[in-house]
């Protein structure tokens, strides 16, 4: 006769059913979306800046002649640096988008990737912000001029060129904000993984 005081093994196993999987956070999908937006913003800023070109017939002061003068992005080293930096940011954006997708598929390596993301995001933020500031400084002088050193405005003549440059800088500022958000999200995600 079997004792009724001891529970059988099958009932113990059924009572110790595995806990439901914890609800998966949306951080991974937000990472993917923000990184893709970084890629799109960087490429857009580069394309808009590269297409910044305009030719105008400008009168020569003191002479009764007019000559065609061209304004293009390649005339300024700051704009060339801007193109280079945002191109690197675009490449970084697509590579980290693919890495973030791999984290969604295999979350085992998430902490290691998040640490690298946080460090590289700060580095990219510095590069993009410095390039945006350099291009913005040149664009501001083109828009307002500088009477102290007798640099005249050029945006009153090359309006389409200045609109392209201004739009490109605005999109680059958006990319900088995205990098700030990505840095904060990566650090917060790492913080949440610290055992309490």
Swiss-Prot record:
Organism: Populus trichocarpa
Any single Gene Ontology cellular-component annotation: plasma membrane
Subunit structure: Homodimer and heterodimers.
Extracellular compartment segments: 51-84, 134-167
Region (Disordered): 1-22
Compartment annotation: Cell membrane
Chain segments annotated as transmembrane: 30-50, 85-105, 113-133, 168-188
Protein name, entry field: CASP-like protein 1D1
Taxonomic path: Eukaryota, Viridiplantae, Streptophyta, Embryophyta, Tracheophyta
Key words, A-Z: Cell membrane, Membrane, Transmembrane, Transmembrane helix
Family under the similarity heading: Belongs to the Casparian strip membrane proteins (CASP) family.
Cytoplasmic compartment residues: 1-29, 106-112, 189-196
Highest taxon listed in the record's lineage: Eukaryota
Membrane topology: Multi-pass membrane protein
Pfam families: CASP_dom (PF04535)
Principal subcellular localisation of the protein: membrane
Compositionally biased residues, Basic and acidic residues: 1-18
């Amino acid at each position: 006769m079997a004792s009724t005081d001891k529970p059988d093994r099958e009932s113990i196993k059924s009572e110790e059913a595995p806990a439901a999987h914890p609800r998966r956070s949306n951080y991974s999908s937000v990472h993917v979306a923000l990184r893709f937006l970084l890629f799109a913003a960087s490429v857009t800023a580069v394309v808009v800046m590269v297409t910044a070109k305009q030719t105008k017939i400008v009168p020569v002061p003191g002479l009764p002649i007019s000559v065609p003068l061209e304004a293009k992005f390649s005339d300024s080293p700051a704009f060339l640096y801007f193109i280079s930096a945002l191109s690197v940011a675009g490449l970084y954006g697509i590579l980290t988008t693919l890495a973030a997708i791999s984290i969604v598929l295999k979350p085992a390596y998430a902490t290691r990737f998040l640490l690298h993301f946080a460090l590289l995001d700060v580095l990219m933020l510095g590069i993009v912000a410095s390039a945006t500031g350099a291009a913005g400084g040149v664009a501001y002088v083109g828009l307002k001029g500088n009477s102290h050193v007798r640099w005249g405005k050029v945006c009153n003549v090359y309006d389409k060129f200045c609109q392209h440059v201004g739009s490109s800088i605005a999109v680059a500022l958006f990319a900088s904000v995205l990098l700030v958000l990505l840095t904060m999200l990566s650090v917060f995600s790492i913080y949440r993984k610290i055992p309490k």
